[in-house]
């Protein structure tokens, strides 16, 4: 969204898209990052990649409609999965059915005639925290997203780090239980099978349907653990034991990350965090402090569900600085 003279910069705008496993959010912003329009939708995952791409195209058009689309200078999308830094394809999004090697960026560039930047949703959110959130001014930190799944965005020496194949920060695959190395967690991954929204919802459902505890809310949504946190807030002992156990596992995973990266700050965000923020911080801090003599600060995001959107806007404003990923077939087009 950078441009030469002041008049063209004032007219320039970009769209940031937050694509989760179950939600879509579209934000139109000007060249200074000021939000102008916003639209929300639910992901129709059963429609497959084709249907979701059509949803995204419709959402982008919706935020552009009140303003002339001539202002569009770029689109940034955070996706719930890995993005190949070479091809720009969505390699996989294990919580959205059918997403393997999807060239969404190229399709959207062809549709809107503007550069499209894609990244893992946790990476986008980490960029947002670095720009406008609690990690502003901090060069070395790890952003951890706890929602339907689990992932992380890693900042080292002031830059987002994606690794060799673009999968740095995929904490969901981390195994912190030596006795379960032979278990097959397939696309879920060990840590995600213990601490994600899907995992907690599933485990809570088993306990409560066996007559342990008395949850409120629906037990039918396989991804929604809100009923579990409602029971926790009512003082249900079964719910507390389940959640505490999951947070201890998370703490061990965080301690491993700290051992390797030595960050100054750990930032938590996501629906699971909102369910029991004080208990999560207390438990994770206790575990990490037992393992590390100089543990990092562990804090909650100050941006909430805006983190990924701000990361997308920052990517549009400074694509070179963020080493932003574009579809390979369109590399070389003018920005």
Residue ranges and their predicted role:
Residues 89-99:
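A charged helix-plus-loop insertion that forms the helical arch/lid used to bind
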Residues 121, 147, 312:
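Active-site glycine-centered loops adjacent to acidic/histidine catalytic or metal-binding residues
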Residues 116-120:
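General beta-strand structural signal in soluble alpha/beta enzymes
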Residues 24-28, 150-155:
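Short beta-strand scaffold segments in enzyme catalytic cores
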Residues 167-171:
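Structural signature of FAD isoalloxazine-binding scaffolds in flavoprotein oxidoreductases
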Residues 1-74, 84-87, 106, 110-114, ...:
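ATP-binding/phosphotransfer module of carbohydrate and carboxylate kinases, centering on a glycine-rich
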